[in-house]
From Swiss-Prot:
Record-stated family: Belongs to the XseA family.
This protein's UniProt keywords: Cytoplasm, Exonuclease, Hydrolase, Nuclease
Name of this protein: Exodeoxyribonuclease 7 large subunit
Cited function: Bidirectionally degrades single-stranded DNA into large acid-insoluble oligonucleotides, which are then degraded further into small acid-soluble oligonucleotides.
Length: 448
């Protein structure tokens, strides 16, 4: 009898925790081990050493946990976007009721459609001899001009230009912008290589882009790009992605660089024997470190296996996962607490600013400005009253003015000497007279 086939007469009432516990046991005991392929996403590697991620395909996804006792045996560095093949047990994370997979082993998934196409084209071109060492053209020791074929907005172009400028700022560079990802990108790359060969303005070309998934780099695995590189009269350095990324373009090119920056190093003029010795020592050191780490890792795996055989590891893993969950919530709570303290400090600073000398000066300045405005208003009022009184006095003066008399229709007559004529006996025929009226003067001569 399973959880879902109990009779009505014997119905069982569960708590949430007891239901989750029984579902977990049902999944782990009934399903057993499963194998599946998918793409890694949301990869998290906390300090506990466990890995948490999502495994997905085009239509669905499932949460996964891989505890450190198992992930130490993984021989490659997983990353988001990596296609993997995993061996897993179905389980349930009881505190949240999340259905999940407990991963026991993981390896790269190399049998996918793109990988198969890659291998088929690689074998076909190799059979034609396009990878033959005899076809490789040597790089110029003293290049006069370097051509770069990549995206004009990508990080790879910035990295290449930075290295070239640091090693030889006077070295001319020609950029042939192209698409490096998506539909039509392979044709765009091939056309850029053809354009560089037609112009013959460079004596070495760097063809590449920054890192990405297999799909992102696929343009450099297209046959048209491979054949265009092989037909190039100008030596080509392939610089696609990171050191672990390998494309068909790498096999056909005259030289392969692990990164765009490394390609700039290869074609730069100042590569010296001392630099080569340093690189050799660096590689020897890397190999020694890898050997040491490999031995330590093997020893650690051996001790881990021994510990797993002696302790109830599964229960410990469950508790550790729960601890990771609590730690995450604690970090969020601490963040909220720090935010609250920060706001409290801001409020205190604001209150202090209200009592600071600077604020007092600002307040006094405001009061001074207000009094200044009142004083100016009072002065304007006094001037207005004075102007009004002046206008009244002018009106009174106007009433006794000769001009006022003239404006009422009267006139004033003077002789040639300016003397006012009041009587008729003051003039005789022939005298010149000037009569003043309100809007001017009238000149006349006495006739009789």
């Amino acid at each position: 009898m399973t959880l879902f086939t109990q009779t009505q007469s014997n119905d069982r009432i569960f708590t949430v925790s007891s239901l989750n516990a029984e579902v977990r046991l049902l999944l782990e005991n009934e399903m057993g081990i499963v194998w599946l392929v998918g793409e890694l996403s949301n990869l998290s590697m906390p300090v506990s050493g466990h890995w948490y991620f999502t495994l997905k395909d085009s239509r669905a996804q499932v949460k996964c946990a891989m505890f450190r006792g198992n992930n130490r045996r993984v021989t490659f560095k997983p990353a988001n976007g990596t296609q993997v093949l995993v061996k897993a047990r179905l389980s349930l994370y009881e505190p949240r009721g999340d259905y999940q997979l407990i991963i026991e082993s993981m390896q790269p998934e190399g049998d996918g459609r793109l990988q198969q196409q890659f291998e088929q084209l690689k074998m076909s071109l190799a059979a034609e001899g396009l990878f033959a060492q005899a076809l490789k053209k040597p790089l110029p020791e003293q290049p006069k001009r370097i051509g770069i074929i990549t995206s004009k907005t990508g990080a790879a172009l910035h990295d290449i230009l930075t290295v070239l400028h640091r090693r030889d700022p006077s070295l001319p560079v020609v950029i042939y912008p192209t698409m490096v990802q998506g539909d039509g990108s392979a044709i765009s790359i091939a056309q850029a290589i053809g354009r560089a060969n037609a112009r013959q303005e460079c004596d070495v070309l760097i063809v590449g882009r920054g890192g990405g998934s297999l799909e992102d780099l696929w343009a450099f695995n297209e046959e048209i790009v491979a054949r265009t590189i092989a037909a190039s009269q100008i030596p080509i350095v392939s610089a696609v992605g990171h050191e672990v990324d390998v494309t068909i373009a790498d096999f056909v090119a005259d030289m392969r660089a692990p990164t765009p920056s490394a390609a700039a190093e290869l074609v730069s003029r100042d590569i010296t024997h001392q630099t080569q010795k340093i690189q050799q020592k660096n590689q020897q050191l890397k190999n020694a470190i890898r050997t040491y780490l490999s031995k330590r890792e093997a020893k650690t795996v051996q001790l881990t296996h021994r510990l797993e055989r002696q302790h109830p590891q599964l229960r410990l893993n469950q508790q550790q996962q729960h601890l990771d969950d609590i730690s995450s919530r604690l970090e969020r709570a601490m963040g909220r607490l720090l935010s609250s303290h920060h706001q409290h400090v801001e409020r205190i600073n604001y209150k202090l600013s209200l009592h600071s000398p600077v604020q007092t000066i600002k307040n006094n300045q405001t009061t001074l400005d207000q009094r200044k405005r009142r004083l100016l208003d009072a002065m304007d009022h006094r001037l207005l009253n004075a102007n009004h009184k002046l206008a009244l006095a002018a009106e009174k003066l106007e009433t006794v003015s000769p001009l006022a008399t003239l404006s009422r229709g009267y006139s004033i007559t003077r002789d040639a000497k300016g003397k006012v004529i009041r009587h008729i006996d003051q003039v005789k025929p022939g005298d010149k007279l000037v009569t003043k009226v309100t809007d001017g003067e009238i000149h006349s001569t006495v006739s009789e």
